[in-house]
Each structure stands twice: as C-alpha cells, then as structure tokens.
C-alpha cells in the first residue's frame, strides 16, 4: 500500500483542477500545467480534493499510484506557493550578473559563461547569490544543477558554485616535507 499514493491532495482556492480522461489539468491565474497518467491510475476529484487509486493489483500499478500522487502534489504546491533554490558563488573574481534573458557568470574561465534563462523560470541575483524560482519543481532543480555544473565546488578551498544548504567536505592540502 502506497503511503504517498493514498494521501488526499487538498487543492487550494487559487488553483483550479479538472480531469479530462486520463489527463489532469491544473491552472492558476498565470500558468497551467498538465499531468498525463496514461490510464495507469484512477483519478477522483471531488470537493477540491484529489485522490488516486491503482488500476490493477500489479506492483507496477502501485508504483505509479505513488508517483502520480507525488507529481500532482508538486504541481499544486508549485502553482500555489512555487519552488525556489538558492546557489552561492564563492571564489576570487567569480561574479554573477543578470543580463537580458541570460545569466552571465564569470567563473575563472577565459570566457564568460552565458546561461539562457528558460521560460517559466525567474532569477534574482544579489551579490554572489542566485535565487531560482518557478512553479515546476523538476525544472527549478534542473536549472540549478546546470548552473552548478559549470564550476562545482572544489574540496580544497571551496571555490565554485554550490547550493546554499550544501556542506562541502574539505580536504587538507599538501604537507611540507620534514
């Protein structure tokens, strides 16, 4: 029995939900998201409460039950409150600036790195901190991971791009000979 799948998802008043066959449609005043279930789960929407039931008794259907429950819950949270990730840029000469539809990063390469900001993502830059906001949890995490991958933090001095809550395990440098 899936503990995540059997949870009932409360839909706030700021989000409208509707079921069309095997599709779930969510929208608020700005955006809309769609979740296709491919008839792997049975969808029930009553009184702004959304629930799922597995179609069969097979283990695969029970796995989809929890997966679609989590995906629908993430869409509801994203449309009502949104998701955000914060990145920190540490290092001498490492700079971040917000251009027109691009994020300009100076990370010690011979050239500046220009990252195009995808649709549905909003970025805020303060000093050397990048805040990535959006309604799609997967897209926010993907953008943060792509920016971090340009210069991941190194273990000796901690220079690079890291998540704000990430702990970098430091290594000792070379020791002098006696």
Curated annotation (Swiss-Prot):
Keyword Lyase: no
SUPFAM superfamilies on file: Ribosomal protein L6
A single GO BP: cytoplasmic translation
GO CC annotations, alphabetized: cytosolic large ribosomal subunit
Pfam families listed in its UniProt record: Ribosomal_L6
UniProt GO MF annotations: rRNA binding; structural constituent of ribosome
Keywords recorded for this protein, A-Z: Ribonucleoprotein, Ribosomal protein, RNA-binding, rRNA-binding
Keyword RNA-binding: yes
Family: Belongs to the universal ribosomal protein uL6 family.
Subunit structure: Part of the 50S ribosomal subunit.
Described function: This protein binds to the 23S rRNA, and is important in its secondary structure. It is located near the subunit interface in the base of the L7/L12 stalk, and near the tRNA binding site of the peptidyltransferase center.
Protein name per its UniProtKB record: Large ribosomal subunit protein uL6
Organism from which the protein derives: Helicobacter pylori (strain J99 / ATCC 700824) (Campylobacter pylori J99)
């Amino acid at each position: 029995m899936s503990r995540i799948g059997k949870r009932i998802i409360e839909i706030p008043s700021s989000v409208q939900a509707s079921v069309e066959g095997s599709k779930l449609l969510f929208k608020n005043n700005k955006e809309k998201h769609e979740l296709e279930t491919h008839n792997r789960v049975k969808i029930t929407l009553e009184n702004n409460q959304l629930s799922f039931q597995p179609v069969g008794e097979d283990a695969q259907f029970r796995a989809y039950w929890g997966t679609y429950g989590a995906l629908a819950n993430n869409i509801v949270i994203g449309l009502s409150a949104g998701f955000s990730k914060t990145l920190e840029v540490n290092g001498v000469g490492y700079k971040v600036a917000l251009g027109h539809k691009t994020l300009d990063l100076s990370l010690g390469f011979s050239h500046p790195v220009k990252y195009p900001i995808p649709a549905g993502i909003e970025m805020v830059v303060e000093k050397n901190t990048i805040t990535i906001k959006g309604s799609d949890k997967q897209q926010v995490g993907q953008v943060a991971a792509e920016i971090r991958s340009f210069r991941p933090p190194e273990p000796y001095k901690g220079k690079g791009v890291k998540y704000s809550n990430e702990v970098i395990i430091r290594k000792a440098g070379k020791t002098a000979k006696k």
